[in-house]
Swiss-Prot record:
It comes from the Bacteria. Binds 1 zinc ion per subunit. This is Queuine tRNA-ribosyltransferase. The active site is at D89, D281. Zn(2+) binds at C319, C321, C324, H351. Signal peptide: none annotated. Homodimer. Within each dimer, one monomer is responsible for RNA recognition and catalysis, while the other monomer binds to the replacement base PreQ1. GO terms for biological process: queuosine biosynthetic process; tRNA-guanine transglycosylation. GO terms for molecular function: metal ion binding; tRNA-guanosine(34) queuine transglycosylase activity. Its EC number is 2.4.2.29. It catalyses: 7-aminomethyl-7-carbaguanine + guanosine(34) in tRNA = 7-aminomethyl-7-carbaguanosine(34) in tRNA + guanine. It comes from Chlamydia abortus (strain DSM 27085 / S26/3). Catalyzes the base-exchange of a guanine (G) residue with the queuine precursor 7-aminomethyl-7-deazaguanine (PreQ1) at position 34 (anticodon wobble position) in tRNAs with GU(N) anticodons (tRNA-Asp, -Asn, -His and -Tyr). Catalysis occurs through a double-displacement mechanism. The nucleophile active site attacks the C1' of nucleotide 34 to detach the guanine base from the RNA, forming a covalent enzyme-RNA intermediate. The proton acceptor active site deprotonates the incoming PreQ1, allowing a nucleophilic attack on the C1' of the ribose to form the product.
Length: 372
């Protein structure tokens, strides 16, 4: 079945809302944080049963083991033994970010083009690129991307789009926006021929140009997408991103869920939740964990700091995650990081992911009480 979206409460203080998305593989309470499982696995975490929605990257799974191989094994849910909802991207983001830099390098897309680009050619038909594994030449079109996502069998899928760096000139930027919407229409048409249980979100581009964002919103509104995803360049920092997300969401109808692509750090969530964003995806908590940055109710903890050398207190006294209930102390976790013990990032990742889920639960409570 295609997803069903219900708004359970609209805040009286802002455009924030509490909702519920129903999919063939389960319920997603919104607003939701969606962790990224690049290759079908959350880095440093084995158990993802408490994660309602997980984001997997089509590009990486297309390169290895291959989406057709996954389809032959019964689809991604069966392959990774997951019974809850999955969202996949088109593969376009990875192709372009490997050439220009990642979301985090700009907030979204102001990285300079890398000297040795993986992109070989972008045409109206699609994009030719080199595999990051063996350098082989691969082609991704709207139809190829959607078929790959159908092979994977994700609950929510994304049409192919072109991600440009912040510094792109105006002429190419406008032609890219136009090409992206043609690609999205082709993606949607291909999806509608065999929708199965899947839903497709339309991606809104336009960079930091309010006029182009309005055009993008009109495009996705005028087509039967099941939800909306805010994509493209969102500026060089949080101050530039916030007004763009604000104006973009103001153009959208309230009957479909809204996802903010590639953004999910705490400051960004806090700054944009009031605009009616229903889900955020990011590798932020697991990446932070691998670098020894621990999220806590008392603020971020840089566990390598010498201050924690003899600190036997729990990482977060208010936390109920496996790490904290196992009495892992700050001193012990610091020791594990200092000696490069793999368990260090595992304990930290378990904690950070749990913290994000509890953080979003608290946000939903605040919206229900009209505090946000």
């Amino acid at each position: 079945m295609a997803l069903k979206f219900h708004v359970l409460h609209q805040s009286k203080k802002s455009r924030a809302r509490v909702g519920r998305i129903e999919t063939a593989h389960g319920i997603i309470d919104t607003p939701a944080f969606v962790p990224v499982a690049t290759n079908g696995a959350l880095k440093g975490v084995v158990d993802h049963s408490n994660i309602q929605l997980m984001f997997c990257n089509t590009y990486h799974l297309l390169v290895h083991p291959g989406t057709e191989a996954i389809a032959a094994m019964g689809g991604l849910h069966k392959f990774i033994h997951r019974n809850s909802p999955i969202i996949t991207d088109s593969g376009g983001f990875q192709i372009f970010s490997l050439a220009y830099g990642s979301v985090a390098e700009e907030i979204k897309s102001c990285g300079k083009k890398k000297g040795s680009s993986s992109i070989l050619e972008v045409t109206d038909e699609g994009v030719w690129f080199k595999s990051y594994r063996d350098g082989s030449k691969l082609f991704l079109s709207p139809e190829v991307s959607v078929q790959a996502q159908k092979d994977l069998g994700a609950d929510i899928i994304i049409p192919l789009d072109e991600l440009l760096p912040f510094h792109s000139d105006t002429t190419y930027f406008l032609s890219s926006c136009a090409r992206t919407y043609v690609w999205e229409k082709r993606s949607l048409d291909y999806h509608k021929k065999d929708p199965r249980h899947q839903s497709m979100y339309g991606v809104i581009h336009g960079g930091i140009d309010p006029k182009q964002r309005k055009i993008g919103c009109a495009f996705v509104e005028d087509h039967p997408f099941d939800g909306f995803a805010i994509g493209g360049s969102l500026g060089r920092n949080l101050n530039e991103m916030v007004p763009i997300v604000d104006i973009t969401t103001s153009y959208l109808s309230k009957d479909r869920p809204v996802h903010l692509l590639g953004i999910g750090d705490l400051p960004s969530i806090q700054a944009t939740i009031g605009f009616g964003i229903d889900s955020f995806d990011s590798s932020y908590p697991t990446k932070a964990a691998r670098h020894g940055l621990i999220l806590s109710s008392q603020g971020p903890i840089k566990i390598a700091n010498q201050a924690y050398t003899n600190d036997l207190s729990p990482i977060d006294p208010e936390c109920t995650c496996l790490t904290c209930t196992s009495k892992i102390s700050r001193a012990y976790l610091r020791h594990l990081f200092k000696v490069h013990e793999p368990n260090a990032s595992i304990w930290a990742s378990i904690h950070n992911l749990h913290y994000m889920q509890e953080f979003m639960k608290n946000i939903r409570e605040q919206i229900l009480h009209d505090r946000i």
